[in-house]
Amino acid sequence: MNNSVYGVAFRSLSTGDEKLYKEATRFYHSLGFQTVKLYDNFKNHDDSNLIVGTSKNSVKECWLESFKLSELDSQGFRVPQQEASNQLQTDGVMIKLRLVDTEPLNQTADTVVYYTVSLDEVSKIGERVDDHNVKLVDPLGNVVLVTDSHDGKELNASEFIAPKDSSVEQKITVELVDKDSKKKKIAVMTSGGDSQGMNAAVRAVVRSSIYYGCDVYAVYEGYEGLVKGGDYLRKMEWKDVRGWLSEGGTLIGTARSKEFRERWGRKQACSNLIDQGIDALVVIGGDGSLTGADLFRSEWPSLVEELVKDGKFTEDEVALYQNLTIVGMVGSIDNDMSGTDSTIGAYSALERICEMVDYIDATAKSHSRAFVVEVMGRHCGWLGLMSGIATAADYIFIPERAAPHGKWQDELKRVCQRHREKGRRNNTVIVAEGALDDQLNPITAEQVKDVLVELGLDTKITTLGHVQRGGTAVAHDRWLATLQGVDAVKAILNMTPETPSPLIGILENKVIRMPLVESVKLTKQVAAAIEAKDFDKAISLRDTEFIELYSNFMSTTVNDDGSQLLPEADRLNIAIVHVGAPSAALNAATRAATLYCLAHGHRPYAITNGFSGLIQTGQVKELSWIDVEDWHNLGGSEIGTNRSVAAEDMGTIAYHFQKNKFDGVIILGGFEGFKSLKQLRDGRDQYPIFNIPMCLIPATVSNNVPGTEYSLGSDTCLNALVKYTDAIKQSASSTRRRVFVVEVQGGHSGYVASFTGLVTGAVSVYTPENAINLKTIQEDLALLKESFKHEQGETRNGKLVIRNEMASDVYTTELLADIITEQSNDRFGVRTAIPGHVQQGGVPSSKDRVIASRFAVKCVKFIEQWNKKNTAADNEDFKILRFNYVNGVKQYTVLDEDLSAAVICVNGSKISFKPIAHIWENETNIELRKGQEIHWEEYNEIGDILSGRSMLRRKIQKEQQEESSLPSVADTPLSSVTVSTSAAKEDSALYV
């Protein structure tokens, strides 16, 4: 039953949707409520002034209060009640809006009634019920009734308020009570096989734990150390993980433990943790390690009970340790965990494989040889599949898609022979160590070699082995491990005993939390399905990206024998053009699109030297299989590119499109490509040939294409910068007390600078989004001095400052270095480093190659689908024009034609085609050549926490506060102090 509730002085409303949270804030502002407090758990968790009254599971809170009947001064500001001339006070209405990380309980069904003396104003945004009442529904679904009467009688302002009672002094005393006086203690461990990026994960857990006010311990030697205890459980300090970002393997060790598999071993581990006061554990490992961790958690209460019975502890001593909090992170080069796109170390291992196979290709071509390359992957073929795509292998053997018993030999021969006949000089076959046929017989590298020898090929075997685990982590794995490590600590602090153990994963570009038990269970089902010979189920349990890429590989490589040719009427002419500055993976994407087109009967055309080449020469080249066969690992652009855009001569471009009868266009490029797509789309009214489907694959090192969070070439750029800055940092550390100011590219987009700063542990990052001024430089100087003051000439103490090339017209890289040098008073030295066009990279990274292949095939399918939507009669002119005239009226033969000019975009966990018209109007900053959304701002915040800048600033602020007795300010990132102020005003403006 819905009741009307009067006189509500305080109300708390919750939502798990950030969009609804903002809409609700705007709604109550429109009713006259004013924001009196904003709280963000990520930024303000340790601010004693802001944390008072906030709820434990709030991600954000906005406190709103109504002061509609208060006296205002000449500026329109509310006069404090004690200073008001009328000595009247309002009843006061407070609303607390909360953004929570779990789905909130249903809100009350009751209608809350508020009084107003401005009912006419309220009626403009609500529904008039009668002369005295207006009904509204807030974005969270709560019904609000606003009235100017009581019992049918209209009230005036004086009747809403009461005389101030001077004999009663309202006093609110808020005390901060630490309900649990002990510090939260978190342990972190690595277990199972090592993988690149584990050290970055440990570093993130250690430093974010310290930042959030926790004690943190490292468990050395995995579960073995957990059982042994003592020196194997070591408290970690900030400096202990300095320099770990660039280290391979795991510096805290890993080992498989037979003892932990026994209950007595787990009981001993429980005892060791309680001895140290630890009740939270971050486990970085594979499915076996994570299964053991969850079993440990489920047994924990009974283990504690047994320890009390054994007399090891008293009831009082274990009172605070009744539950163990477990958070899992997947560290595995196999990438075999269900529910997550990639695991820590997988892309680094893939990069090693690609490097080795690229080297092998050179000698194989020289001698016209075949190579069989064995890669890791006992129950998972991710490395086998991705390396097959990235290295242009002729054939792959993976466990999820077993080869047909007794038949795979002939198919392998046919594929390799066909590719030789097309002009290929070498053959590469990738064999996962867990490869088998559909009768569960293992397929070994030796067996594959014997088949190729029968074909008459000089064949060699290369088993890569533990090379795949070696080396430092690539940029992707450092980024993944860092973000997941911080999120693991935040998960621990937000968890209750009832919360299921989470597993930190990633979907496309978004870090997610999944139920650990369910993820491990799904992972083990893959091996069970293979054992049961249910290979369709096995591959279906992999993520959609895996299935999609496997299908693409088969289409472009194994089944390029004419079996997939479409009917003549469905075969298309598809143009491919590169626009803008060169970036890695342009050739890899062109290769994948070409091979997919050829396998289906389409004719791919390369527009050479960009749109200016088409305008000036009209040169178009039809691409063949042998033209693109070895483009998978070539940087730059084989068909030529420049910064010319379509608008230079639309008429000539339309002529050549019509002349070559193009049915679709794939543009690869950065902002120039983006602009060209918009120009072609806008030219449709004048040039009907542009009605063909057109799509853009974002490809630029700057990653500044609006609408998407990923561009081809940006990963290669970041890997180049990681190698460069690692070398620079080593030099800075060797010299002791040295700072390098490194200038990176990116135009007006700070993505490259922010990402580089995060994965290299930079002290400061200057980006165009956060303006540089003297104040920020002074604060950075104070931080550098403070940082070096505590260092006693240890190793790994070199510092990096990352500056985007467009961060400031005044404060250039050289000027920044000069200012820091001048103010350092010889406490430390400063040098500059500008990598320049080295950032474009040479050989494209494995990640860029794989994503290039995926995007390219998606774009060809996009063009196919839009051509199928053409309902024109079998008339060539109508088919090309995509419209005809019926009784003098122009009628389009393709519905929603505007959607056929689109950009392939990655947003969070989603890949989609976004119409260029929508992105241009809603998501583009045309003047600054980038998107409006700064999706990488979190990198700066996390980077500041892990580099120590946030903690040092907090310390300096505290000292200043003690000296001046001023209240502390919110903890905001240093390099965005001035912008944070304006950003706060801007944020408020959204709600007011």
From Swiss-Prot:
Chain sites annotated for binding beta-D-fructose 6-phosphate 1: 332-334, 376-378, 433, 466-469
Q: Where is the active site?
A: 334
**Binding-site residues, ATP:** 193, 256-257, 286-289
Organism expressing this protein natively? Kluyveromyces lactis (strain ATCC 8585 / CBS 2359 / DSM 70799 / NBRC 1267 / NRRL Y-1140 / WM37)
Which proteins does it associate with, and in what oligomeric form?
A: Heterooctamer of 4 alpha and 4 beta chains.
**Residues that coordinate or bind beta-D-fructose 2,6-bisphosphate 1:** 643, 700-704, 745-747, 805, 837-840, 929
Supply the alphabetized keyword list.
Allosteric enzyme, ATP-binding, Cytoplasm, Glycolysis, Kinase, Magnesium, Metal-binding, Nucleotide-binding, Transferase
The molecule here is called ATP-dependent 6-phosphofructokinase subunit alpha
Q: Which NCBIfam families match?
A: 6PF1K_euk
